[in-house]
From Swiss-Prot:
Known function: Catalyzes the final step of fatty acid oxidation in which acetyl-CoA is released and the CoA ester of a fatty acid two carbons shorter is formed.
InterPro entries: FadA (IPR012805), Thiolase (IPR002155), Thiolase-like (IPR016039), Thiolase-like_sf_Thiolase (IPR050215), Thiolase_acyl_enz_int_AS (IPR020615), Thiolase_AS (IPR020610), Thiolase_C (IPR020617), Thiolase_CS (IPR020613)
Gene3D superfamilies the UniProt entry points to: 3.40.47.10
Keywords: Acyltransferase, Cytoplasm, Fatty acid metabolism, Lipid degradation, Lipid metabolism, Transferase
Organism, as annotated: Escherichia coli O139:H28 (strain E24377A / ETEC)
Subunit record text: Heterotetramer of two alpha chains (FadB) and two beta chains (FadA).
Designated name of the protein: 3-ketoacyl-CoA thiolase
Length: 387
């Protein structure tokens, strides 16, 4: 079986969805920009030699509809002979795109693929056109489709206080801002055109979603966002609304060596699981355990973790039940996470994997794990091994 390697991984800056830098930039253009950039950064691979493009996107309508993967590839002037498909596993879409490409390579059906994902939540809101079947409530809790209430449920089940959530959210912003100031994101962010507050076209090379002034005291003043009577989850402890894209160049190890391209990491194992939709945010726990089992590893073998921060109330129970609560500051989301950077749904799986690869290199660790919860009760995880 072929070994699957990550040759390169990049992303756009994360832009605020409301009046942000990408308010006049379409999702297809964000995607095409990264496709072009990956190919330009790795000229040894001819674009025509790509076997397929796998691109995650959740709200596949309006500018994100009609197979955005193919639309973006055509805009990027990828040869017409290269196919492209859009993948949807809700929040895990671009990580699923990676898994799909990896399996094609493992089976020998592909040698080189572009993978990634995008979501422009400013142009296509998360709730746009959603119409849940009324009979769904016969099988799952009525609130299972309301992500904020599933986070409230997890917080109550696991004893996660409002204070704990506020502290974690403040940490996310502080670490993301520190990473920005130190240049830790420089290797992963591709400068991307957008408009500043005055409408001036410029190149952005930083995440504008981060709020460096965030404090626990300020967060404590916010009202509950989903359960106004007894809730603890606020807008400040939820993932920010942002627009962005991320992309990876995935190849067989043999093809990478043939082309003289240095792999950054191998895909050691992959897993996806289902869980109760009422506690959808718990999905990373069984997904991570399954991925580790497949890799023949334990939690203690993993040097750094990237866990998508849908909500502080959601990620803290996952950290606790993976036995990592005492190691948060050594291993978990060391450059902050989605609370500070935002969670552009179809982009996030590739985004956290890209950030993880850079952290693995910076911390000089052998193994890293990226994992995310998924709406309606799923979890997805990937174990990476540095080459």
């Amino acid at each position: 079986m072929e070994q699957v390697v990550i040759v390169d991984a990049i992303r756009t800056p994360m832009s605020r969805s409301k009046g942000g830098a990408f308010r006049n930039v379409r999702a297809e253009d964000l995607s095409a920009h990264l496709m072009r950039s990956l190919l330009a950064r790795n000229p040894a691979l001819e674009a025509a030699a790509l076997d397929d493009i796998y691109w995650g996107c959740v709200q596949q309508t309006l500018e994100q509809g009609f197979n955005i993967a193919r639309n973006a590839a055509l805009l990027a002037e990828v040869p017409h002979s290269v196919p492209a498909v859009t993948v949807n596993r809700l929040c895990g879409s671009s990580m699923q795109a990676l898994h799909d490409a990896a399996r094609m390579i493992m089976s020998g059906d592909a040698q080189a693929c572009l993978v990634g994902g995008v979501e422009h939540m400013g142009h296509v809101p998360m709730s746009h056109g959603v119409d849940f079947h009324p009979g769904l409530s016969r099988n799952v809790a009525k609130a299972a489709g309301m992500m904020g209430l599933t986070a409230e449920m997890l917080a109550r089940m696991h004893g996660i206080s409002r204070e704990m959530q506020d502290a974690f959210a403040a940490r996310s912003h502080a670490r993301a801002w520190a990473a920005t100031q130190s240049g830790a994101f420089k290797n992963e962010i591709i400068p991307t055109g957008g408009h500043d507050a005055d409408g001036v076209l410029k190149q952005f090379n930083y995440d504008e979603v981060i709020r460096p002034e965030t404090t626990v005291e300020a967060l404590a003043t916010l009202r509950p966002a989903f359960d106004p009577v007894s809730g603890t989850v606020t807008a400040g402890t939820s993932s920010a609304l942002s627009d962005g894209a991320a992309a990876m160049l995935v190849m067989s190890e043999s093809r990478a060596h043939e082309l003289g391209l240095k792999p950054r990491a191998r895909v050691r194992s992959m897993a996806v699981v289902g869980c109760d939709p009422a506690i959808m945010g718990y999905g990373p726990v069984p997904a991570s355990k399954l991925a580790l089992k497949k890799a023949g590893l334990s939690v203690s073998d993993i040097g750094v973790f990237e866990m998508n921060e849908a909500f502080a109330a959601q990620i803290l129970p996952c950290i606790k039940d993976l036995g990592l609560i005492e190691q948060i500051d050594e291993k978990i989301n060391l450059n902050g996470g989605a609370i500070a950077l935002g969670h552009p749904l179809g982009c996030s799986g590739a985004r956290i994997s890209t950030t993880l690869l850079n952290l693995m290199e910076r911390k000089d660790v052998q193994f890293g794990l990226a994992t995310m919860c998924i709406g309606l009760g799923q979890g997805i995880a990937t174990v990476f091994e540095r080459v």
